């Protein structure tokens, strides 16, 4: 798992310095309980994904910013529901069951770096993601305030849109959703359902996107199960059979590009283990070409260039 440092309200919301006597904010460690608390009071949930005992940027964020009186005052004034999801490495610090539960949440929200903070409503729909700390607490609070301003603007536009009907309602709701960063829009399932209900002809494409999202979830789960079933098979006949299984999955015409990329990369890695670098390079290129234009595809180019150098040296 990658880390940040690579293992890697309204505008008037106060940034005022807190009194020294202000009590430290309480952090919930149960994600679902935090959402429930937020729903009951229509509050914002601030979720921190952290590695408290091994991640230097996480320690800096906590000691310099989240434990500061400025943040305590901000959290109190804005009634934030604070949730800490810690991923410690100290043996026995948390149970395996709790670690798995948190890893599932991390995957659900696409968290790939520590520390990551996400701001969301009580339904679990996020509208902001902050990766890494800032140098000072006031700088971080500015980021939080901008996120809260976005939320308030979003809610205002939704309220206006709900007074409309038919295609006008769908158009206004879709425009409101555009305020949310593109990578977070898909989590706003209730809002998307509202848009689709007012857009039976799917002019805004959310019906198609929802279908693709369901397929991605199903295929991602299938891929996860495949990885688990192949764990430890790193040599000889077992490795060959693993490739055959991956090839069978790749033969499906409905396989989505990101999944196709990962399977090609899996096969490439298996050939690399056997030092069959030409075949490894072949599948690396297939992986890159499976999802052109994606970040994952662009990240493979250095691998391809390195493999080409290895092959050239062995000639």
Enumerate the language-model features and the residues they cover.
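Bacterial N-terminal signal peptides that target proteins for export
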Residues: 1-12
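Thiol-based oxidoreductase modules, predominantly thioredoxin-like and allied folds used
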Residues: 24-29, 50-51, 64-100, 111-114
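A short beta-strand-turn-helix
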Residues: 27-45, 75
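Short active-site neighborhood of thiol/selenol oxidoreductases, capturing the structured segment around
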Residues: 41-55
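Loop/turn elements at helix/coil->beta-strand transitions in domains of secreted/extracellular proteins
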Residues: 41-45, 78-83, 112-115, 122-125
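Non-catalytic, surface beta->alpha helical segment in thiol-disulfide oxidoreductase systems
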Residues: 64-66, 104-152
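Non-globular targeting/processing and membrane-anchoring segments
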Residues: 145-315
């Amino acid at each position: 798992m990658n880390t940040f440092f690579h293992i890697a309200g309204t505008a008037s919301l106060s940034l005022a310095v807190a009194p020294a006597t202000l009590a430290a904010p309480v952090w919930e460690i149960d994600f679902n309980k935090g959402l429930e608390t937020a729903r009951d009071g229509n509050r914002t949930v601030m979720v921190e994904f952290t590695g408290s005992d091994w991640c230097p940027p996480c320690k800096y964020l906590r000691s310099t910013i989240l434990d500061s009186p400025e943040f305590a005052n901000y959290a109190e004034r804005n009634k934030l529901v604070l949730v800490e999801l810690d991923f410690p490495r100290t043996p026995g610090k948390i149970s395996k069951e709790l670690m798995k539960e948190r890893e599932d949440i991390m995957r659900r929200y696409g968290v790939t770096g520590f520390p990551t903070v996400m701001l969301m409503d009580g339904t679990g729909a996020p509208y902001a993601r902050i990766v890494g700390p800032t140098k000072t607490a006031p700088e971080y609070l500015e980021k939080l305030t901008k996120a809260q301003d976005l939320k308030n603007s979003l809610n205002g536009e939704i309220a206006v849109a709900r007074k409309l009907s038919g295609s006008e309602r769908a158009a206004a709701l879709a425009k409101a959703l555009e305020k949310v960063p593109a990578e977070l829009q898909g989590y706003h399932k209730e809002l998307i359902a509202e848009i689709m209900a007012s857009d039976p002809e799917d002019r805004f494409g959310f019906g198609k996107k929802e279908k693709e999202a369901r397929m991605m979830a199903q295929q991602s789960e299938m891929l996860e199960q495949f990885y688990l079933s192949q764990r430890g098979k790193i040599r000889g006949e077992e490795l060959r059979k693993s490739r055959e299984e991956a090839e069978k999955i790749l033969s499906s015409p409905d396989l989505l590009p990101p999944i196709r990329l990962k399977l090609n990369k899996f096969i490439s890695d298996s050939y690399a283990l056997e030092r069959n670098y030409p075949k490894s390079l072949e599948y690396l290129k297939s992986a890159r070409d499976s999802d052109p234009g994606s970040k994952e595809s662009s990240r493979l180019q250095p691998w391809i260039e390195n493999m080409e150098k290895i092959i050239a040296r062995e000639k």
